[in-house]
């Protein structure tokens, strides 16, 4: 039982962490105009959306 429980937690972390990272990356890309890091590199893509 402990091994299956550990495998479940491990797989949950393995899937959950990259998912949270991708969601955060998507949100930061959507708000790229406000962020100084994305304002220069993403201006061509996010400019017309203004």
UniProtKB/Swiss-Prot annotation:
The record ties this protein, via InterPro entries, to:
PSII_PsbM, PSII_PsbM_sf
Q: For this UniProt entry, which segments traverse the membrane?
A: 7-27
Which superkingdom does the taxonomy of this entry point to? Bacteria
Q: How is this protein positioned relative to the membrane?
A: Single-pass membrane protein
What's any one GO cellular component for it? plasma membrane-derived thylakoid membrane
* BP GO annotations: photosynthesis, light reaction
Alphabetized, the UniProt keywords read:
Membrane, Photosynthesis, Photosystem II, Reaction center, Thylakoid, Transmembrane, Transmembrane helix
Q: How does it assemble?
A: PSII is composed of 1 copy each of membrane proteins PsbA, PsbB, PsbC, PsbD, PsbE, PsbF, PsbH, PsbI, PsbJ, PsbK, PsbL, PsbM, PsbT, PsbX, PsbY, Psb30/Ycf12, peripheral proteins PsbO, CyanoQ (PsbQ), PsbU, PsbV and a large number of cofactors. It forms dimeric complexes.
Its annotated function is as follows: One of the components of the core complex of photosystem II (PSII). PSII is a light-driven water:plastoquinone oxidoreductase that uses light energy to abstract electrons from H(2)O, generating O(2) and a proton gradient subsequently used for ATP formation. It consists of a core antenna complex that captures photons, and an electron transfer chain that converts photonic excitation into a charge separation. This subunit is found at the monomer-monomer interface.
- For this entry, the protein name equals Photosystem II reaction center protein M
Source organism of the structure: Prochlorococcus marinus (strain MIT 9515)
Q: Which gene encodes it?
A: psbM
């Amino acid at each position: 039982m402990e091994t299956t429980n550990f495998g479940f937690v491990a797989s949950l972390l393995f899937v959950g962490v990259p998912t949270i990272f991708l969601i955060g990356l998507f949100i930061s890309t959507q708000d790229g105009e406000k962020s100084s890091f994305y304002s220069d590199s993403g201006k061509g893509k996010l400019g017309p959306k203004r």
